[in-house]
């Protein structure tokens, strides 16, 4: 929604979601796992690539209890080169009238994470996971998309990096991926969550314990989205609706892919899918972290 004017100077923000508990990682804080020869963490590479692509600011979403560690490991260093702000995601940061159900431990999901940025992010943005590496081209494509003019005031105008399936697969077992369905203009129709994707003995890509195969060049979503501040405003209304239905759940999450898919189905958003040749790297599990070194 809104009108972007050609030629106006536009600043852009990188939002990094780093508040997840990371229960599958097994040791330490996975977002701060050292990856490079000089003890770089995966965010170092993402922030460098984002700056090279033209992003001006970094907003890092974390838990309050790991603030000092984040600043020691990366924040105090990168603030010399980019504007950096921290936003805290808390399980009890809820709208008036709602409370945390007894026994719930995990945050409310990526939708709530981005919503936490409402008072901080006032520019076009790209949002990524802290523990994933997306590559240089993905940042460039989405940055250029954000600064292009558009005048559709009836729908949320968004972008998504489309990764080639074969560039996202793990050697450590099967994975779940969001298979993208697009039209002839590369506009997103929907994302189908597909489980159990991996190579069989013949080197073919299969899924969900079937003999059916997937094309290795199929585009998938790796949760790298581009949007504008009005989308964050919408998340506030959507979060109240989500809590009205799921507020007593121990594990229900307010997730960006589901939120955006609902907007697509209601014809309230348009999402441009930009194909990137970059290889995606993640450190969801500790063995995958070691294999990435």
PLM feature spans:
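Short beta-strand-to-loop acidic/aromatic patch adjacent to the donor-nucleotide binding site
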Residues: 123-133
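Short, surface-exposed amphipathic charged segments that create phosphate/polyanion-binding patches used
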Residues: 96-107, 173-178, 287-291
